[in-house]
């Protein structure tokens, strides 16, 4: 959406339908965002480096610069509707908040309270990461199609075995404070323009939050968990080998 030609085409189509274009966005405090981003790319079998190696290459990702959204909304003549993506919103439901933002009553829709994309936990991240490392070490690469198939295999398998977990954290307090410091100025520019408040006031429960990393690369699990992890990696890898045996789209 940040590519102007795509944004123009999208919002022009909205106007052709005689609808008023609104740009609903969910800015999030960057440390929590980068933590979530890491989980998604690892769980999707697209990355396998340690969290601390992932952060430097992603910390200045364009999607983290929320002030650009103001210019984007003005450029396509759309109303910007910013909804702070906080821990409270996660609990209360993002879908319900979105429906309210576009003027709809969430009670008219079923299942708005269900969380459909919960952040995976350290066990899930570790298994997916180890499988990706095994693939990379063998000199092979997954195609986009194969990676999606692997992801679809992983979650049901862990759920069936009772091993699915949530709540991964790769952040340390020092790393989180550094990320917040790097984005403080841009965040305040955005927050003052759209909410007339400083960023830390809008995200009071998120800015300065304490973190304890539970990544298995950092906090080694107990022997029983390690045994389960090694067995799970072995079994998932067998499924991945079957997936890779079939030709698919170009590699990632």
Language model features with spans:
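Anion-recognition interface
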Residues: 1-252
